[in-house]
């Protein structure tokens, strides 16, 4: 029996009634992947911030950026949406590292514009290509009243970023570890974890060892609902990316169909990984 097709068919069956289009990429970081629409292009929404973080650490490694340098929130960088910097006001000064951390963990849009200005949009795109993500582009800073598109990527590119973080090969071992620590603090992972057994995730309440943790970055705009990252299990890590488009409901809420069906697929993959002791398939 073709086990790969069996798993893909199970995912397809789960998505049969979904009124949208979902692409899936899963890598067990051993020798197997699941790929459904892996090379389709998607609006990135805030998932582009993961690529920007990688570029920042690349530039730090070259001495062209400094995590301890202070940068200033300027009026031109204001944008609505997620984040905390709106509460601080124009003129606030933050270290580059703290700004980048806010860009990821609470998906701060103003912090993102600050880092884009710090690095330069053209430099960001050149470095994204240099890092090997050939189908990923940052089109514009975050200004929703001026631009319809933020970025473009594919599930394969996004999965490759997290696979390199997990393996310690994105920029360097030290940079990968630093980025992993930031991704682990990211607040918004409902699509990946909503259907996980909460016992696995809540070691602070249960007092048990942390069995499962997530290092991820999600992104949502009218045109997309995306999530992707590293899932740690007792058997090791795997990478999962779920990207959604062509749905009808543009309102953002946790029970959005893309979130509901994404969570079902994510749980299906988790169960498969646990049943196969860290692999996608028993061979």
Identify the role of each PLM range.
Residues 1-14, 18, 33, 169-190, ...:
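Structured C-terminal helix/loop/strand segments within mature extracytoplasmic catalytic/sensor domains
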Residues 19-41:
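Short, conserved catalytic-motif segment at the N-terminal edge
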Residues 21, 114-170:
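Mid-domain, small-residue-enriched loop/turn segments at the edges of structured enzyme/sensor domains
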Residues 36-43, 89, 100, 147-148, ...:
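A short glycine/serine-rich beta->alpha loop
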Residues 43-71, 240:
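Active-site SXXK
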Residues 54-62, 117, 160-167, 267-274:
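Short glycine/serine- and small hydrophobic-enriched flexible loop segments
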Residues 62-88:
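Short, glycine/proline-biased beta-turn/loop segments that scaffold the active-site neighborhood
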Residues 78-113, 151:
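Conserved catalytic neighborhood of penicillin-recognizing serine enzymes
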């Amino acid at each position: 029996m073709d086990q790969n097709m069996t798993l893909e068919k199970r995912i397809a069956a789960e998505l049969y009634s979904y009124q949208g289009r979902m692409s899936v990429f899963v890598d067990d970081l051993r020798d197997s992947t699941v790929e459904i629409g892996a090379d389709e292009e998607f609006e990135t929404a805030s998932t582009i911030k993961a690529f920007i973080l990688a570029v920042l650490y690349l530039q730090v490694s070259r001495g062209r950026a400094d995590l301890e340098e202070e940068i200033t929130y300027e009026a031109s960088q204001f944008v609505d949406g997620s984040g905390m910097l709106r509460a601080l006001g124009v003129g606030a000064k933050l270290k580059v590292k703290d700004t980048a951390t806010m860009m990821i963990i609470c998906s701060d849009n103003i912090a993102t514009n600050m880092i884009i200005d710090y690095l330069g949009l053209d430099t960001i795109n050149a470095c994204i290509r240099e890092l090997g993500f050939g189908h990923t582009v940052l089109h514009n800073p975050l200004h929703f009243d001026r631009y319809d598109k933020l970025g473009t990527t594919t599930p394969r590119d996004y999965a490759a970023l997290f696979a390199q973080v997990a393996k310690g090969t994105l920029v360097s071992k030290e940079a990968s570890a630093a980025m992993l620590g930031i991704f682990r603090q990211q607040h918004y992972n409902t699509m990946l974890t909503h259907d996980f057994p909460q016992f696995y995730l809540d070691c602070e309440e249960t007092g048990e060892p942390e069995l499962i943790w997530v290092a991820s970055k999600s992104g949502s705009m009218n045109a997309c609902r995306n999530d992707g990252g590293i899932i740690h299990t007792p058997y090791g890590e795997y990478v999962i990316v779920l990207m959604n488009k062509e749905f009808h409901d543009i309102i953002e809420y946790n029970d959005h169909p893309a979130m509901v069906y994404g969570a079902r697929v994510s749980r299906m993959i988790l169960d498969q990984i646990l049943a196969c002791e860290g692999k996608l398939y028993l061979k």
